[in-house]
């Protein structure tokens, strides 16, 4: 088996940057930053969302609109008036008198 083909699997400290929540988990994440947690030094990875801040786990429904896409949409289309629904038109096949539709041909 070849040496040095797989990344090193080790315990890494993950820190939620929005809540400050910290947890240790096995990972191959590569970093030079380290931090002391519960008396041991671990490589550290800063994450923006974890189980302590994600709405699914916290039960809060919060709209995160970092891009402002909803505001742009509302600003662009707020002045447009909704048009009245168009009446449906029925289209019928009109054949000249005396001509009948030919039956569908069967494929062999």
Curated annotation (Swiss-Prot):
GO (cellular component) term, any one: ribosome
A GO term for molecular function: structural constituent of ribosome
Region (Disordered): 85-108
Pfam families: Ribosomal_L31
Statement: the UniProt record of this protein carries the keyword Cell membrane: no
HAMAP family: Ribosomal_bL31_2
Family: Belongs to the bacterial ribosomal protein bL31 family. Type B subfamily.
Protein name (Swiss-Prot/TrEMBL): Large ribosomal subunit protein bL31B
Organism: Chlamydia trachomatis serovar D (strain ATCC VR-885 / DSM 19411 / UW-3/Cx)
Highest classification ranks of the organism: Bacteria, Pseudomonadati, Chlamydiota, Chlamydiia, Chlamydiales
């Amino acid at each position: 088996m070849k040496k040095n083909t797989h990344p090193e699997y080790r315990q890494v400290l993950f820190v939620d940057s929005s809540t400050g929540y910290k947890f240790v988990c096995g990972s191959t994440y590569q970093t030079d930053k380290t931090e002391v947690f519960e008396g041991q030094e671990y490589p550290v990875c800063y994450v923006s969302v974890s189980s302590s801040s994600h709405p699914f786990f916290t039960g809060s429904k919060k709209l995160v609109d970092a891009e402002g896409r909803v505001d742009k949409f509302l600003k662009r289309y707020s002045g447009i008036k909704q048009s009245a629904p168009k009446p449906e038109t029925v289209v019928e096949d009109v054949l000249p008198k005396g001509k009948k539709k030919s039956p569908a041909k069967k494929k062999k």
